[in-house]
């Protein structure tokens, strides 16, 4: 009986971060998108557009601001547009009425309340531009020549590899798959 119910999708858990589920909620999503433990405003999902090659990690995207609901009887609403090749870091909050351009990194904990131009790395609350995306990537490529680089996927590392990594990263950072 359980297998029948699972086939009918009655007992299957709902993955609220699956691209398939979010598309059904009206969110426009490009290709190669990873949404990890994030909250996307499903009440106005049709106002969210996400480009291709985007990663969203433990972030919140809000298309509405209910601060005016009780005094005015209405919530403020606005679109959220996210370009291509974007990384949104842990605990970032994207507020309504904002556009994030292409080739952008939004740092962890960042609050995005205004548009972010293409080719930007932003940090802070409120968000501010730290540097250009291409400069950031160039700097990180240079660091890969002087820092430890680990070629085994983190979930496939042996205990010995984990210990080696632990020791090598005592006072520095490195790069992992």
Description of each model-found segment:
Residues 1-85, 92-94, 102, 118, ...:
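Domain-scale signature associated with acetyltransferase and cell-envelope carbohydrate enzymes
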Residues 87, 105, 121-122:
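Short-chain dehydrogenase/reductase
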Residues 92-105, 110-114:
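Beta-rich strand-turn-strand
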């Amino acid at each position: 009986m359980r297998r029948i119910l699972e086939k009918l999708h009655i007992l299957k858990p709902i993955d609220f971060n699956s691209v398939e589920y979010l598309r059904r909620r009206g969110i426009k999503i490009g290709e190669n998108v990873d949404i990890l433990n994030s909250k996307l405003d499903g009440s106005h999902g049709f106002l969210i557009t996400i480009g291709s090659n985007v990663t969203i990690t433990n972030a919140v995207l809000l298309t509405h601001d209910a601060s005016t609901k009780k005094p005015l009887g209405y919530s403020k609403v606005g679109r959220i547009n996210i370009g291509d090749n974007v990384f949104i870091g842990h605990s970032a909050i994207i507020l309504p009425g904002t556009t994030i351009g292409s080739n952008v990194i939004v740092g962890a904990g960042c609050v995005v309340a205004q548009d972010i131009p293409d080719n930007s790395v932003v940090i802070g609350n409120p968000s501010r531009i730290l540097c250009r995306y291409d400069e950031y990537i160039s700097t990180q490529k240079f660091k890969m020549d002087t820092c430890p680089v680990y070629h085994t996927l983190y979930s496939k590392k042996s205990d010995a590899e984990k210990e080696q990594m632990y020791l090598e990263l005592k006072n520095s950072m490195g790069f992992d798959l």
